[in-house]
Amino acid sequence: MRLDSAAKALFLKEFVGAFALSMRYFFKPRPTLNYPHEKNPQSPRYRGEHALRRYPNGEERCIACKLCEAICPAKAITIEAGPRRNDGTRRTTRYDIDMVKCIYCGFCQEACPVDAIVEGPNAEFAVETREELYYDKDRLLQNGARWEREIARNIALDAPYR
């Protein structure tokens, strides 16, 4: 037994094994990314910052059906509907989302019959104060205008699975 221990110590078996393992990983490509300069590709189903969409003619998509408000498990959505218009449709006068309460489950997006509320591709919306995470209708519409191209592409890619 002593001879075996002496042979291992003499030939530095553990050191050579560890060094060989290190060299194997040293020459492989790095699995890490240099964030924020490099980013992982996102799934079309990624759930990020909320946005309200418009139709191509500029009209808001939201018809004030309040399904998203009803289905939200965190009760983070508040909607107030305006009076009916001449054509019988309604629009929202207030559409607020408390992003502090939101759990990003995507139920609001699934419940919406006209794809008005969506969770967009933006994951970088860090803020300095809690009040900035209370989104009103104007902020949601701005997000929709900002990310419309990516949102439309993601919805089109996901359409066969809906």
Curated annotation (Swiss-Prot):
Membrane topology: Peripheral membrane protein
Cell compartment(s), UniProt: Cell inner membrane
EC number: 7.1.1.-
GO BP terms: aerobic respiration
InterPro entries: 4Fe4S_Fe-S-bd, 4Fe4S_Fe_S_CS, NADH_quinone_OxRdtase_chainI
Residue positions binding [4Fe-4S] cluster 2: C72, C102, C105, C108
Cofactor(s) required for function per UniProt: [4Fe-4S] cluster
Matching Pfam families: Fer4_7 (PF12838)
GO molecular function: 4 iron, 4 sulfur cluster binding; iron ion binding; NADH:ubiquinone reductase (non-electrogenic) activity; quinone binding
Keyword rRNA-binding: no
Domain 4Fe-4S ferredoxin-type: 52-82, 93-122
Top-level division of the source organism's lineage: Bacteria
Binding site for [4Fe-4S] cluster 1: C62, C65, C68, C112
Entry keyword set: 4Fe-4S, Cell inner membrane, Cell membrane, Iron, Iron-sulfur, Membrane, Metal-binding, NAD, Quinone, Repeat, Translocase, Ubiquinone
Catalyzed chemical reaction(s): a quinone + NADH + 5 H(+)(in) = a quinol + NAD(+) + 4 H(+)(out)
UniProt cofactor note: Binds 2 [4Fe-4S] clusters per subunit.
Any one Gene Ontology cellular component term annotated for this protein: plasma membrane
Cited function: NDH-1 shuttles electrons from NADH, via FMN and iron-sulfur (Fe-S) centers, to quinones in the respiratory chain. The immediate electron acceptor for the enzyme in this species is believed to be ubiquinone. Couples the redox reaction to proton translocation (for every two electrons transferred, four hydrogen ions are translocated across the cytoplasmic membrane), and thus conserves the redox energy in a proton gradient.
Subunit structure: NDH-1 is composed of 14 different subunits. Subunits NuoA, H, J, K, L, M, N constitute the membrane sector of the complex.
Similarity section: Belongs to the complex I 23 kDa subunit family.
PANTHER family: NADH DEHYDROGENASE [UBIQUINONE] IRON-SULFUR PROTEIN 8, MITOCHONDRIAL, NADH DEHYDROGENASE UBIQUINONE IRON-SULFUR PROTEIN 8, MITOCHONDRIAL
Record's protein name: NADH-quinone oxidoreductase subunit I
